[in-house]
Structures are given as structure tokens and as C-alpha cells.
Amino acid sequence: MVDNYAKKDSFSKNVQREFDRNGERYSFLKWGQSAFNNFRVVPPGTGICHQVNLEYLSKVVWSSEANGQLFAYPDTLVGTDSHTTMVNGLSVLGWGVGGIEAEAAMLGQPISMLIPEVIGFEINGKLTEGTTASDLVLTIVQMLRKKGVVGKFVEFFGSGLKNLSLADRATIANMAPEYGATCGFFPTDDETIKYLKFSGRDENTIALVKKYSKEQGLWSNQNDQIEFTDTISLDLNSVVPSISGPKRPQDKVLLTNAAKDFDKAFKENTKRKVPLEAKVNNKEFKIKDGDIVIGAITSCTNTSNPSVMIGAGLVAKKAVEKGLKVKPWVKTSLAPGSQVV
């Protein structure tokens, strides 16, 4: 929660407030970590849980011993947040579930589900200069919303996968709730291995992932003729800079049409005829419809993608150079996906 903002010590103060609010919870969880062998706690302030899964917790392939035999099996994940699906960018099948289901899974109970339809999403080409993973994912959201993928799995394949970084794949997988699918899965390939090395996984784990995936037919192979329930395709060269809104992520708006679309939405939604009086730092301000009151770079989708974060930093740098200033009533916040990002 952002209580303090626009000051050099805002981060440390907000972290301290979190400890003050949740000290009892943190103490209980710390006890749990020492009491149970299969229970780990990631310290507060480390990052957004989905990014921590990518960087630290997920193994892609696990191994364990039972009855004197060593078994290897695919990594899976269920979480209580809808954007748990982000881990599918790392070839780990996972999605969000309800609290009771998650608790049952923690206690060793299975989660039941119907075998889903699988929609193949073919990706070809390469993103043009000036377009980002955010532009791509908004395009995919719009396409899959029109297609109708509620309750279905989406698996991405095609020659264009080699042109998508793991961070870009994670961005796409993260938005599965927005395009309506249970998950958006990326198969294991060289980019997966590259990320595991980059994030400091040990050599034995990486070797196991590569060998197991290839032996079990889980390794991405463009020559394989996979049978999907249905397919859809996208040429990355056709993706252009976009935003979405004003309310739904599938309402994609080309950046070139942003001003016109804002004017249209403003006229349709404006209801306040008299400005609202607000007091900030003991000063009175009048705020009217259309004024920005929150400037936040905090979503688990964008703040976990280094290239998008760099883009935000460059825009901020240019804004400072041009002498632009934030209005006193605007609450600003930045929450990177992790300390690594």
C-alpha cells in the first residue's frame, strides 16, 4: 500500500508501514517456515509474487525420491491471484484458484477440473521498432476476446517465438485473465534455458529441464504437427503502439487515436459539473473531471518487463528535461516487479 509518495524516503517508509500493519502475520509465517520442511516464505519487499515465481521459486521440472526411485515431473502452480498465470511464460502450467482450493492443495488434496479445449495461437514475424510487449499483449487480448477462450487453455507456437524474450512471454501469459483463458502457455525452448541461466538456477536443474523436456516431447519443435481444438495466428510485424480503455483491457485504442478517443469517452462519462475541492499539503485545489489524480507504474504485468520499465524511465527523463512537473494533487507511485527488475 502506498501511504507515502513523492519523497526520497517514501519506499523505506512504506515498507516500514507494511511491517507495522502485518507484523503478527509475518511472525506467524516465519514460524511456519521453520516448522515445516516444504514451506518457504519470501521476505516482504522482495517483489510481486508472480515475478518472484519466475526468478526464484519455479524449477520447470522437479525431481523427488519415492520408494527408492528418483522421479522427475513437470512443475505446476496454483495461486490465489488471477495473474498466477504469468508463470506459464516460463513453461510452468499454472493458474489462479479460490482460497479453499489453494488451501486444499497445500494440504495435499488434488484439484479437480474438466479436460479443457486447447487453442493454438501461432506467432510469426518480429515486433517492429517502437512497439513493446504491452502493445503486443493488448492486441492478443482483443483477438482472443473476439475468439472466445473462456475456460480454455491457449498455447503459443510458431516461428515468431524465437523473437520474444522470456519477459515478453511472461507479459502475455500474465494477461490470461484479461483475454479470458484459464492460462496462456509457452513451451520449453532455448529462451527458457537462457532465462534459467540468467536468473541463477543451478546447472543440474537446467540440465534436467532440457533433457526431460526433450525426452517427454515438451520441447518446442516447429516441425511438430500439434492437434489443437482450433488455431489463430498473428504476425508480430502488424502490431502497432496501443493503449486500452477507458474501462476494459480488450477495448484497444491505437496510440494515434488516443486524443480523439479520450475526448469521446470524456463526453460520454462526464457527470461532475462543479469542480471538487481538495486539500493537499494545506493548500486548496479545484479538481474537475478529466484531471489526473493518480500516476502509478505498479501493475504486475508491466513492472516485471525490463524493456517496458526502461521505456518508462526514458519518458520520465525526457519529461524532466522538458521541465514538466507533476501537479500537487497527483499521487505518484512506482513498484518494480522485483529487486532484480
Tell where the protein language model's regions lie, with residue ranges.
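Fe-S-dependent hydro-lyases/dehydratases of central metabolism
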Residues: 1-341
